[in-house]
Regions:
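Active-site beta-loop-alpha junctions enriched in small/polar residues
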Residues: 66-68, 99-101, 121-125, 161-163, ...
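Alpha-helical scaffold elements within enzyme catalytic domains, especially in hydrolases
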Residues: 86, 109, 148, 152, ...
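Hydrophobic faces of well-ordered beta-strands that scaffold small-molecule active sites
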Residues: 61, 94-96, 118-120, 156-160, ...
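Auxiliary Fe-S-binding modules of radical SAM enzymes
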Residues: 171-281
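Short acidic/glycine-rich loop or secondary-structure boundary segments that cap or lie
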Residues: 128-129, 166-169, 193-195
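Surface-exposed cleft-lining segments at the edges of enzyme active sites
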Residues: 69-71, 127-135, 155-161, 220
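Conserved strand-turn element in the central/C-terminal portion of the radical SAM core barrel
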Residues: 147-168, 219-223
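Conserved Radical SAM active-site core
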Residues: 1-117, 125-128, 139-143, 150-151
Length: 281
């Protein structure tokens, strides 16, 4: 994923029962000792109590970088809640990423974490496509949970990811979420590893008219679609009076201001360029 850099990733579980077909975290399976396919196992983490949490004051922690911290198992085991209880009073800036409205259970703790924000992954408004891709809660529940958190004064992010070319309607999702979020993150679909063939097979079966587009992007490396979508979303933002930036997660607008749209389409190119420049230094 092209998620913004944080000081500490935190994942209360190994594995994720949401079983997203495009999950970049599936590489974690090889470290798990499991034979089951990714998405069909979950290991519950236990850890020693955090000592002197205040020493992390000012650091950023991202909860849910390679698992969903509010997958159904959390209702039983409560490891994410246990983590948040330890972080209250630490001074850490906490970001949570989820596809579940179970996060609402922990509003009492999240509201005690200054600067906390909760992101919801939404890459379609089509419930049929959503159910083909993940086993998380329906989209309406995600949007409702986003609103409840935002209404409670907690910063929220609509994470439009992964954007499926020809399928994900970015402006439509922004319209559905703009009254209940502070940030909109945009991340393109990256196909790598074992799930590339699965996703391309799905497109061939369910959306054959898109096969030439997917071949151009994912077999030939053509970036035209993303450049054109960048122009389209920028024009939409200008029409709607929304701030639009690339690869910059530092924007802090007033809570009641319209959401800032952050485009991460070109994050990998920027990282490669930085490495190249660094190599010549």
């Amino acid at each position: 994923s092209n998620l913004p850099v944080c000081d500490y990733p935190a994942n209360p579980y190994v594995g994720c029962s949401h079983a997203c077909r495009y999950c970049y975290a599936s590489f974690m399976k090889r470290f798990s000792g499991h034979d089951e396919p990714w998405g069909q196992f979950v290991d519950v983490k236990r850890w020693k109590p955090l000592k002197n949490a205040r020493k992390y004051d000012g650091k950023q922690v991202f909860v849910g970088s390679v698992c969903d911290p509010y997958m159904p198992e959390e209702a039983e085991y409560g490891r994410t809640r246990a983590l948040l209880e330890e972080l209250v009073g630490s001074g850490m800036e906490v970001s949570i990423q989820t596809k579940s409205d179970l996060v609402l259970r922990d509003i009492d703790l999240i509201s005690q974490l200054p600067g906390a924000r909760v992101g919801f992954s939404i890459n379609t408004l089509d419930e049929g496509f959503r159910s083909d891709m993940d086993a998380a809660v329906p989209l309406a529940r995600r949007l409702a949970a986003m609103k409840e958190l935002h209404d409670a004064g907690i910063r929220t992010t609509c994470f439009i990811s992964p954007i499926f070319p020809g399928i994900t309607d970015v402006p439509a999702i922004i319209e559905a979420a703009r009254d209940r979020c502070n940030l909109v993150w945009l991340e393109n679909l990256n196909l790598r590893g074992g799930f590339k063939a699965d996703i391309l097979g799905y497109i061939a079966e369910k959306r054959p008219e898109l096969v030439p587009l997917y071949d151009a992007i994912y077999q030939k490396g053509d970036r035209t679609y993303w450049r054109e979508l960048d122009v389209e979303v920028r024009a939409y933002a200008e029409r709607e009076g929304l701030e639009y930036v690339r690869d910059d997660d530092t924007v802090r607008s007033p809570f009641d201001a319209p959401p800032v749209i952050v485009n991460y389409f070109f994050h990998e190119e920027i990282k490669k360029s930085a490495k190249k420049e660094g190599g010549h230094a």
